[in-house]
Amino acid sequence: MSAKIIDGKQVAQTIRNQVAAQVQQRLAQGKRAPGLAVILVGVDPASQVYVGSKRRACEEVGFISRSYDLDATASQEELLALIDKLNEDADVDGILVQLPLPAHCDTTQVLERIRPDKDVDGFHPYNVGRLAQRIPALRPCTPKGIMTLIEATGVKTHGLHAVVVGASNIVGRPMTLELLLAGCTTTTCHRFTQDLEDQVRRADLLVVAVGKPNFIPGEWIKPGALVIDVGINRLADGSLVGDVEFETARNHASFITPVPGGVGPMTVASLMENTLSACQDYHDNAQ
């Protein structure tokens, strides 16, 4: 068996095209373009790359993109004041604070300061809570994008045994909630899990998000499983690999995401969807 490769770039492009078409429709109706404010604190190289891709995606779909690049020494108070200002700006539908923040910043306080109806990253406790209660509003972008990829395979999720490896607030925990909502029997593995191999071998649907290169041996993959690899790790030779041993895993799985070109593009595409949704669902009537 050789797995079908899930082309995240292609699926993401389809989503961006759909968003762009809806933006053009809005403009034709005399409505404004959705607006996204992106805040970057400091000069972390990886964060700069991610922010750049988000800003380019905004331009591609026709959003108004606003950039706020703060010095690494910017105080918590300065950052909160900027968020307060953007919360009240009627032309801003989404506010994104690029993580990680410098050590002196209180990330929880920052994320909670963003109005839930402008929380297009889906990290505010209100939005995570809605997902947990099966009434999702603005959903965390990476898990949302993963669900879109799974839907693109045509695989029916009801009754599948899903295993999530990694329990971060950004991916693992909300991913577990998404899979429960999709009808899976879901297991979440983390650093205290003692029988990781046994859990992985039982997975009909495996999502791995730990940030460790080739952490899951390909031999562990259940024959016919659907494998979603969220990790993106740079090796000493400069090559990029995921958290799953790809070449071996693809001989066991039915579907697998590549690294790069799998989950990454979907995160940005989901951000575009969320920003459009925030504009249409929450802010159009407030104009």
From Swiss-Prot:
Gene behind the chain: folD
Ligand binding (NADP(+)): G166, A167, S168, I232
Family as reported in the entry's similarity comment: Belongs to the tetrahydrofolate dehydrogenase/cyclohydrolase family.
Protein name: Bifunctional protein FolD
Catalytic activity from the UniProt record: (6R)-5,10-methylene-5,6,7,8-tetrahydrofolate + NADP(+) = (6R)-5,10-methenyltetrahydrofolate + NADPH; (6R)-5,10-methenyltetrahydrofolate + H2O = (6R)-10-formyltetrahydrofolate + H(+)
Upper taxonomic lineage: Bacteria, Pseudomonadati, Pseudomonadota, Gammaproteobacteria, Aeromonadales
Xref: InterPro entries: Aminoacid_DH-like_N_sf, NAD(P)-bd_dom_sf, THF_DH/CycHdrlase, THF_DH/CycHdrlase_cat_dom, THF_DH/CycHdrlase_CS, THF_DH/CycHdrlase_NAD-bd_dom
UniProt-recorded Gene Ontology molecular function terms: methenyltetrahydrofolate cyclohydrolase activity; methylenetetrahydrofolate dehydrogenase (NADP+) activity
Subunit structure: Homodimer.
